[in-house]
Design a protein with these regions (language model features):
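N-terminal secretory targeting and juxtamembrane "stalk" segments of secreted and cell-surface proteins
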Residues: 2-12
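Amphipathic N-proximal alpha-helical interface segments
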Residues: 10-53, 82-134, 167-203
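Phosphate/adenylate-binding glycine loop and adjacent helical scaffold
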Residues: 60-61
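Amphipathic alpha-helical segments
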Residues: 68-83, 142-161
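Short, recurring structural edge motifs at helix starts
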Residues: 135-140
Length: 203
């Protein structure tokens, strides 16, 4: 069989689905929490190969010279947003688009749009109207327990740091440990969801 005929007989990949997008979220989180990702993967009924293929296709979509803008890409993959919320940031009138994420029922995937339609932020947030976690001490900062905004509010003032990748965020904050002693730490997030807490200065 010639290469051309083999190519012609190869099935074309199906559309990129909301399930595929959840695998993209998980793929980045596997660097810090492989056990949680493994559990989630089994819950979704997919293989490691499925997760890798979804991530490969997503990277190809985002890096293609013909790539759509972020908002259009998310609409094509996730469908119309379940909720559109006006958001004022300083003097700017912005818009937040939110989609459900079945793997995390109390979270939504949010794309924050600037007035010109450009995507400023793309991350997981708590569903509007849903109570967030009780965050009082370092013991409460467990993987996948909270979002960037929730940690920043609970342990204000928190200082944002540059993330180690486009989908990662870091906050420097001070929180009491189990004995009530304040400790300075760095909370690391992927796609807006807490992954781990580190103590770079040995505090």
């Amino acid at each position: 069989m010639s290469a051309s005929s083999a190519s012609a007989s190869s099935p074309k990949p199906g559309p990129f689905t909301p399930l595929d997008f959840q695998l993209v979220l998980l793929r980045r989180m596997a660097d810090h929490n492989p056990d949680l990702v493994e559990e989630a993967r089994h819950q979704l009924g997919v293989s490691i190969a499925d997760m890798r293929e979804a991530n490969r296709r997503w990277q190809a979509m985002t890096r293609s010279p013909r790539a759509r803008g972020s908002a259009s890409r998310y609409r094509s993959v996730l469908g119309p947003p379940a909720l559109t919320v006006p958001r004022r940031i300083g003097d700017l009138e912005c818009e937040a688009l939110l989609w459900p994420v079945p793997l995390w029922p109390t979270l939504r995937f949010e794309v924050l749009l600037a007035p010109n339609g450009a995507a400023w932020n793309e991350w997981l947030v708590r569903t509007p109207g849903t109570p967030g976690p009780e965050l009082h001490t370092l013991d409460d900062l467990t993987p996948w327990s909270c979002t960037v905004d929730e940690a920043a509010r609970a342990f204000a003032p928190a200082r944002p740091m540059e993330g180690t990748a486009p989908t990662r965020w870091r906050l420097v904050l001070t929180a009491p440990d189990g004995s009530g002693q304040p400790r300075r730490c760095v909370a690391e997030f992927t796609w807006g969801l807490l992954q781990r807490v580190s103590f770079p200065d040995g505090a």
